[in-house]
Structure formats: structure tokens, C-alpha cells
């Protein structure tokens, strides 16, 4: 399974995954409690500086991640402006940019196996109720991994459509995209079954899938 983490090593890569996600949770709570434009603006600058300290590749990847979000924030800002709540819209936009930027920085500096291992450790109490801790761990890993895969697959299909037609595809890419993802899901299910599935690990065996 591929990871979204940057291949280069930075100071943030050396931090334990538990520490990074713990600090991320605290930062998210703090951002929700900041109610001033100056405070949220300062938070965005701090997140930008943090991302810049990770290197040029981190900056480029963060910009790619935030690009679709800018349009969503712009639409919300326009709506709030029409409602006479410009300050509220700006505050919301800054908060979202800071949160997503910070979460993206953690994702870029934490290899996927470390994320899976962390979630599996946190989910160990579920084993008392007969629920395998691997289920939430693998579920989160699949979501993180397949979101960019879905976007890349859509871009590939759209490029193939443009090579054959000058018309916009509109919803005509939905069927081939769905079938290709279902095929990937079948292969993923076979791979999971070959590695023991998601059942509770037996005693004496390693509980962290790699």
C-alpha cells in the first residue's frame, strides 16, 4: 500500500505519530475557539510557516490539496456577503484553511503504516466487544489512500475523453469510474483475505498489519 507521506525526511518525520496527532487534536480545538479575524489570520500564517519548513515538495503538495478548497471557501464567502456577514465568512474561511493545512502537514510527514499502527493501538479496547481493532485502522488507511487515487482516476478518464471528443463529459465518466473503483475494491478484498482478513489477531501473533 502506498503512502501519501513525502519521501524526503524532515524534522517532522522524526516525531512520533502519536505526538503529531495529539498536537493536531489540540490545535483543532484551539482553532475552533479562536473568534477573531486577527487570531485566525495569525493561525494561517503559522500553518504556512510550518508547511514551508518541510520543504518545497510539501509546499507544492499543500497547494494542490488546498486548491479545490479555495473555491468552496469562496462560494461560502460570497453567500455570507450576500447575507451581510462578511466577517463571519472570512473567519470561517481562515479557520478551514488553517485546519486543512495543518492536517495536511501531519499527513505529509507521517507514513501510512505509522497511522495504521496508531489507530490500531487506540482501537484495542474494541477487542473486548469482539470487534477487531484492524477494522477502523484499515478503514482510515483506505480512505486516506483512495481519495487521491479516485481523483487521479477521474483525471485519467477525463483526459481520455478529451482526446476523443470536444464535448464536455458531464456525467458520462461516472459509470466507467464506478466500475474501475469496484474492480479495485475486489482486488483489495482479495489482498486483505490473503493477509488474514480483519479478524481479531490470535494471541502470540503480531497485531499490526504492514
Swiss-Prot record:
Cellular component aspect of the GO annotation: plasma membrane
The keyword Hydrolase belongs to this UniProt entry's keyword annotation: no
Protein location: Cell inner membrane
Keywords assigned by UniProt, alphabetized: Cell inner membrane, Cell membrane, Membrane, Transmembrane, Transmembrane helix, Transport
Transmembrane region(s): 11-31, 34-54, 72-92, 99-119
Segments on the Extracellular side according to the record's topology features: 32-33, 93-98
Main localization (coarse): membrane
Membrane topology: Multi-pass membrane protein
Cytoplasmic side: 1-10, 55-71, 120-210
Tagged with keyword Cell membrane: yes
Function: Probably involved in biotin uptake, although complementation experiments in E.coli do not indicate a clear role.
Similarity remark: Belongs to the CbiQ family.
Subunit architecture: Part of a biotin transporter holocomplex composed of BioM, BioN and BioY. BioMN complexes can be readily purified, but not BioNY complexes. Only the BioMNY complex has ATPase activity.
Name of this chain's protein: Energy-coupling factor transporter transmembrane protein BioN
Organism: Rhodobacter capsulatus (strain ATCC BAA-309 / NBRC 16581 / SB1003)
Gene: bioN
